[in-house]
Amino acid sequence: MKIQTGQIWENAGKEFRVIDVVDIDDHTWVHYKNQQTGLEHSCYQESFEARFTPILNRN
């Protein structure tokens, strides 16, 4: 599944909204925001996909 801005993903009952996807130096970074706390985070796409599951019926 292609990660896109605006998608909602979850982990351990917490929801995260993808706020940006950026390619830098042969790596894809995913920037995302915790929907409950508002804290923003980023990690490599591979790590993001290993940690989170997409919520397919919501944007």
What are these regions (language model features)?
Residues 1-12:
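Short coil-to-beta transition motif at edge beta-strands of beta-rich domains
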Residues 37-59:
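Intrinsically disordered, low-complexity, charged/polar segments
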Residues 12-45:
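Basic/aromatic-rich interaction segments and small domains that mediate binding to polyanionic partners
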